[in-house]
Amino acid sequence: HTAYRRQRQMCIRDRNYCMLNKKDFLKYASTLAFPIMLQNLIGTLVNIADTVMLGYVSQTAMSASSLANQYTFILFCLYYGMATGTSVLCAQYWGKGDKKTVEKILGLAERISLIISLIFFVISFTMPTAIMKIFTNSPDTIAAGSEYLKVISFSFLFMGFSQIFMSSLRSIGKIMLPSVTYIVSLCVNVLCNASFIFGLFGLPKLGVTGVALGTVIARISE
């Protein structure tokens, strides 16, 4: 009887411990999940802001940027795959306390992303018209999209670095810096877009080129 009572007390204690652990886990997971959701939302809004604000320029400009961003989306998918793989490896070795390996993994990923960025940059900067002809046969849309794509291609050189680096930071539990970075990037993008579209602060009205330039500035600040 005494052994049974002792075993029952141990079971109750273990169950309470598991419940506490579950609560702690859910609390910790929520503190990580919400900022990451916010970061992804803001990162998407940076691209959406271009399209929405181009609606104030013309429907042609808005259509051109949307089609040009299809090319950018391909690059973003490559970044996303690399960032996901890098973050998994970084989290694994960070948990082991092997910071040197984490640095090597991050360095290798950044070098690969730079090579990919350079390839996409060269193609979009030298052949923007050929890229736009894949998505449309409208001369006006091709002209506006080519202008937009040629300028925004400079953002590729910075976007890969930030995407992989911030994904790696999230994987080791450092979520504040990526959150602040994305918020600053969104604010800079909207401010620059408005300035170049409406000619604020004495700046020239650059239309579709101005929106692309605003995105480049936002990516540099990011």
Q: Can you say where each PLM-predicted feature lies in the sequence?
A:
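Short membrane-interface helical motifs at transmembrane helix boundaries
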Residues: 119-150, 198
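Helix-terminus/linker motif at the lipid-water interface of multi-pass membrane proteins
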Residues: 41, 45-63, 132-139, 195-206
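Small-residue-rich hydrophobic transmembrane alpha-helices
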Residues: 62-125, 159-178
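Residue-level signal for short hydrophobic patches within transmembrane helices
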Residues: 22, 26-45, 49, 71-78, ...
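Residue-level recognition of pore/gate-forming positions within transmembrane alpha-helices
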Residues: 36, 44, 70-73, 108, ...
